[in-house]
Regions:
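Sec-dependent signal peptide recognition
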Residues: 2-8
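Flexible, processing/modification-adjacent segments and terminal tails
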Residues: 90-160, 182
């Protein structure tokens, strides 16, 4: 009798284990999109820790140094502070009614150069193509590429397209901007001199093919609520 009771108890335990397994099926890991892979390669997973970003956007031509625009951005509050020449503007992007349009347009432009890998994830209204092979515009090296195309209405860049070339590690190396999705390139530059700022990787220099034109980002600071090693 004791033996029969033990067998019955063992049977109950086995059934219980099987029931638990069926109630907790193995979680299927979601495949990342190409936008997420590129963003993560540049440190997007650390963006949640970012409290403040500072940088200066300038364009140097030959020996002429650009004056630049300096920005402080608090992304969690979406507050922006701009300094350029004698102009100082502080505003919230949650209320743009009283903000000069040229100031916010400049911020969106300059932020795009600094954080285009993340814009691929942030800009949900844009269309991103499938990955294909293409010849990079500056190095003429064959790389993987995608095109991000913006809607024809709304925003500061309606209908514009960007061809983005990246390496095997999903790091952006070059791009081409095509205004209004024109077949003719409007601007092509490199993405080089990457630095890591508390886990966020930013390309500091963007040069044309002749090397005498350089759109650069300086004075970069990324402040986080926790230290990223």
């Amino acid at each position: 009798m004791k033996s029969l009771f033990s067998i019955l108890m063992l049977f109950v335990v086995i059934i219980s284990c099987k029931s638990d397994k069926s109630e907790n099926p193995t979680e299927v890991k979601k495949e990342l999109t190409i936008a997420e892979k590129i963003a993560n390669a540049h440190g997007y997973e650390n963006w949640k820790n970012v409290e403040e970003v500072q940088f200066t956007f300038a364009v140097d031509r030959d020996t002429i140094k650009g004056n630049g625009r300096s920005w402080t951005w608090l992304p969690k509050k979406d507050s922006v502070y701009m300094q350029t020449g004698l102009q100082n503007i502080k505003y919230s992007r949650k209320n743009l009614d009283s903000v000069p349009k040229n100031a916010d347009r400049a911020f969106i432009n300059d932020k795009y150069w600094a954080f285009v890998p993340f814009q691929l994830v942030w800009d949900t209204s844009a269309t991103i193509s499938e990955v294909k092979k293409g010849k990079a515009p500056i190095s003429e090296t064959e790389m993987d590429m995608i095109t991000i195309l913006y809607p024809s209405e709304g925003g500061y860049t309606p209908g514009d397209a960007y061809d983005i070339y990246f390496d095997n590690n999903y790091m952006i190396k070059e791009w081409t901007f095509r205004k209004g999705n024109s077949e003719t390139p409007s601007l092509s530059t490199t993405f080089e001199n990457y630095e890591d700022y508390n886990g966020i990787k930013i390309a500091r220099d963007h040069k044309k093919d002749n090397g005498s034109w350089n759109l650069n980002l300086t004075g970069i600071k990324v402040k986080t609520k926790i230290k990223v090693f």
